[in-house]
A protein has these predicted regions:
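Nucleic-acid endo/exonuclease domains
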Residues: 1-170
Length: 170
């Protein structure tokens, strides 16, 4: 695993949360967990370090399928108060932790416009689709990021930064 320039690899999520004034367990993560339980979608890891992972970062919810993994991140307010480099480095380090599997990341903003019922239905269907189809294998990096409830400006910003950070590692 290569370190990400400008982002300390030893940064703990709790440290980031303290630095940016975010509580450690958010109500929308708890609500999402209720939805997952109600729908029968079972995750393998939630808010804890992956076994034997070379990183201290951990997923909100990690689902393990036969050929790939699906990472669900509950990003309140598009995580706009978070350091974007830290966000991208975190996903990269989690990708490095799932040895030879491709990764489908769903970044879900529970504060997007629209009804909670519609956001719930869309999210649960996205997870089912991601588990059924290994979309990550279609991308050279082995990783695909799907944004739910994000503004187009934020998606463009994060994608551009992600590409720039990947180019630094080449």
């Amino acid at each position: 695993m290569k370190p990400t320039p400008g982002v300390p690899s030893t940064y703990l999520c709790a440290t980031c949360r303290d630095e940016y004034g975010v509580s450690s367990r958010k109500k929308w993560e708890e609500q999402t967990e209720i939805w997952l339980n109600e729908s029968g979608l079972l995750w393998s890891y939630c808010n804890k370090k992956l076994p034997c992972a070379p990183t201290t970062r951990y997923p909100d919810y990690m689902f393990v399928a036969r050929e790939h993994c699906v990472l669900l991140e509950v990003d309140e307010q598009e995580h706009e108060r978070y350091n974007p480099k830290c966000e991208i480095a975190r996903i990269s380090e989690l990708m490095d932790s799932i040895d030879f599997k491709s990764l489908h990341v769903i970044r879900y903003n529970p504060h997007a416009p629209g009804s909670t019922a519609d956001r719930k239905a869309t999210l649960l269907q996205a997870i089912r689709d991601a588990l059924a189809t290994n979309f990550g294998v279609l991308n050279e990096s082995g990783c695909v990021v799907q944004y739910q409830g994000y503004s187009q400006d934020r998606i463009v910003q994060l994608d551009a930064l992600s590409c720039a950070m990947q180019d630094q590692h080449k």
